Curated annotation (Swiss-Prot):
Regulates intra- and extracellular levels of inorganic pyrophosphate (PPi), probably functioning as PPi transporter. It is found in: Membrane. Pfam families: ANKH (PF07260). One of its GO terms (molecular function) is phosphate transmembrane transporter activity. The keyword Transport applies. It is a multi-pass membrane protein. This is Progressive ankylosis protein homolog. It comes from Tetraodon nigroviridis (Spotted green pufferfish). PANTHER family: PROGRESSIVE ANKYLOSIS PROTEIN HOMOLOG. InterPro entries: ANKH (IPR009887). GO terms for cellular component: plasma membrane.
Length: 487
C-alpha cells in the first residue's frame, strides 16, 4: 500500500500564499476594470487606451521601486523605531517621484520622452502627459500601503493583505461604474480610470493601516532586541532595498521601453497606436495566470527560523524542502492555467470582449501575444524562489546585475526581431519573455555564487562539525552542506 506524505506542513504555506495570489490576480483584474472604463468611451477609445497605457506604464516605473518597501517591512521592521526609519525612507522616495511626475508633465523633458521617443502624435502625447500629471501622487499612496502590507506578512496576516487588495479592486470597479454615468465621460474621460485607481489605493491603505494598528502596533517593542540583531539602520535598509528597487524599476520600465520600440518600429502610424493599445489590453490578461508566482518571494522570509514571529512557534513543520515542493506545484498550476486560457480556441477573445469590452476584431489581434505569455511562469518561478532565499540571507546586492542583463536582452530583442519579420504587440511580448529569461539566468548564477561562498566559509564548516560531529572528511562535509542548504 502506497503511503502519501503528510500534507500538514503545506497548509501553512497554502494559507499564507493564497491571499497573496488573490492579491496579485486582483491587481490585474483592477487594471482590466480601468481599461474597460476607457474602452467604454465610444469616442476615440483606441487613442484614449493608448494614452492611458503610456502614462500608466511610465507611472509604474515609479511605483515599482516604492512597492518593494513591502520587503523592507517583511525583513527589517521588528520594532516601532524600525518602522519610523522605513517610513522616512519611503516618504523621501515618494516625494521625489511626485516631483519627477510634475517635471515630466510640464517641461520639455516630458515632450521628449512621450512625443518624440514614442513617435506618437500631438493628441496622444498631450493626453498622456495630462494623465501622467494626474497620477503624480499615486506612487506615495501605493507605497504607504505596501510597507504596512509587508509588516502584516511578517506576522502571517496575509489574509488582511489579500482582503485589502480585493477591496481595492472592488472599489475600482464600483467607481468606474459610477463615473461612467457622470459627465466625466464627456468632460475628461481620462479621469475615470485615474480617480478609480486613487480610490482603490485609498481603500487598500486604510485596510492595511487599520490591520497594522489593531494587530501589530501594540505588540511589537519600541526597539529591537539583540536576538534579532538590534534596530535596523537606514544604511542597512537602503543596501537591502536598492537592488530590489533597481530590479523592479527595470521590470516596470520594460513596458515603456517595449511601447517605445513597438511604436517607433511602426513609425507612429495608426498601426503603432493600435499595437500600443493591444499591449495595454494584453498586459493584465496575460499577467493574471502567472503574476501571482512573484509572491513566492515572501515565503522564505516569512517562514525563516530567524523571523521573530516564528521563534514563538519553533515547532513549525515547514522546512526548505517543503517550500521547494510547494513552489514546483505552484509552477505546474500556473502553466496549466496559461495553456487552458490562452491556447483553448476563442477563450482569450471572450475574456477580452466580455471583461475589457473591446470589439472582437481587436481581441483577435491579442491572441498571439497572449499565447507567448504562456511561457512566462518558468523564468518567473525560478527568479522568485531564488530571490526569496537571497532576501532571507540579506544578500540582495548580488541581484543587481540581473536587472542590467534584463534590459540588455530586452533591447537587443526589440532591435533584432523586426529584421526577422516580428512586429507589433508580438514583438513587444516576445522581447519581454527574452528579458525575463535573461534576468532569471543571472539570478540563478548569483544564487550559485552565494551558495558556494557559504559552503566554503570557515563558519559554515564549523557549523557542520557542530551539527554533525561524526562527519569526517571533506566529502562528508559537502554532502552535509547540501542537506542543510537544500533540504
Amino acid at each position: 500500500m502506497v503511503e502519501f506524505p503528510s500534507l500538514s506542513p503545506y497548509w501553512p504555506l497554502i494559507r499564507f500564499l493564497v491571499p497573496l495570489a488573490i492579491t496579485n490576480v486582483a491587481i490585474d483584474l483592477g487594471e482590466q476594470a480601468l481599461n474597460r472604463g476607457i474602452a467604454t468611451v465610444k469616442e476615440d477609445a483606441v487613442e484614449m487606451l493608448a494614452s492611458y497605457g503610456l502614462a500608466y506604464s511610465l507611472m509604474k516605473f515609479f511605483t515599482g521601486p516604492l512597492s518593494d518597501f513591502k520587503n523592507v517591512g517583511l525583513v527589517f521592521v521588528n520594532s516601532k523605531r524600525d518602522r519610523r526609519k522605513a517610513m522616512f525612507l519611503l516618504v523621501t522616495a515618494g516625494v521625489t517621484a511626485f516631483v519627477l511626475h510634475i517635471l515630466i508633465a510640464y517641461t520639455d523633458l516630458g515632450y521628449y520622452i512621450i512625443n518624440k521617443l514614442h513617435h506618437v502624435d500631438e493628441s496622444v502625447g498631450g493626453k498622456t502627459r495630462k494623465a501622467f500629471l494626474f497620477l503624480a501622487a499615486f506612487p506615495l499612496l501605493d507605497a504607504l500601503a505596501w510597507i504596512h502590507a509587508g509588516i502584516l506578512l511578517k506576522h502571517k496576516y496575509s489574509l488582511i493583505v489579500g482582503s485589502a487588495s480585493i477591496s481595492d479592486v472592488v472599489a475600482q470597479i464600483v467607481f468606474v461604474a459610477i463615473l461612467l454615468h457622470s459627465n466625466l465621460e464627456c468632460a475628461e474621460p481620462l479621469l475615470i480610470p485615474i480617480l478609480s485607481l486613487y480610490m482603490g489605493a485609498l481603500v487598500r491603505f486604510t485596510i492595511v493601516g487599520l490591520g497594522y494598528y489593531c494587530n501589530i502596533h501594540d505588540n511589537i517593542p519600541d526597539t529591537s532586541g539583540l536576538d534579532v540583531g538590534g534596530d535596523a539602520t537606514i544604511k542597512k535598509m537602503l543596501s537591502f532595498w536598492w537592488p530590489l528597487a533597481l530590479i523592479l524599476a527595470t521590470q516596470r520600465i520594460s513596458r515603456p521601453i517595449v511601447n517605445l520600440f513597438v511604436s517607433r518600429d511602426l513609425k507612429g502610424t495608426s498601426e503603432a497606436t493600435e499595437a500600443v493599445a493591444v499591449l495595454t489590453a494584453t498586459y493584465p490578461v496575460g499577467h493574471m495566470p502567472y503574476g501571482w508566482l512573484t509572491e513566492l518571494r515572501a515565503v522564505y522570509p516569512a517562514f525563516d527560523k530567524n523571523n521573530p514571529s516564528n521563534k514563538i512557534n519553533a515547532s513549525s513543520p515547514v522546512t526548505k524542502s517543503h517550500i521547494k515542493k510547494f513552489t514546483f506545484c505552484c509552477l505546474a498550476l500556473s502553466l496549466m492555467l496559461c495553456f487552458v486560457l490562452f491556447w483553448t480556441p476563442h477563450v482569450s477573445e471572450k475574456i477580452l470582449v466580455d471583461v475589457i469590452g473591446v470589439d472582437y476584431a481587436f481581441a483577435e489581434l491579442c491572441v498571439v501575444p497572449l499565447r507567448i505569455f504562456s511561457f512566462f511562469p518558468l523564468p518567473v518561478t525560478l527568479r522568485a524562489h531564488l530571490t526569496a532565499w537571497l532576501m532571507t540571507l540579506k544578500k540582495t546586492f548580488v541581484l543587481a546585475p540581473s536587472s542590467v542583463l534584463r534590459i540588455i536582452v530586452l533591447i537587443t530583442s526589440l532591435v533584432v526581431l523586426p529584421y526577422m519579420g516580428v512586429h507589433g504587440a508580438t514583438l513587444g511580448v516576445g522581447s519581454l519573455l527574452a528579458g525575463f529569461v535573461g534576468e532569471s539566468t543571472m539570478v540563478a548564477i548569483a544564487a550559485c555564487y552565494v551558495y558556494r561562498r557559504q559552503v566554503s566559509s570557515p563558519g559554515w564548516t564549523q557549523q557542520l562539525l557542530t551539527v554533525y560531529p561524526s562527519s569526517v572528511g571533506r566529502g562528508s562535509l559537502l554532502i552535509r552542506s547540501k542537506q542543510l542548504c537544500l533540504s
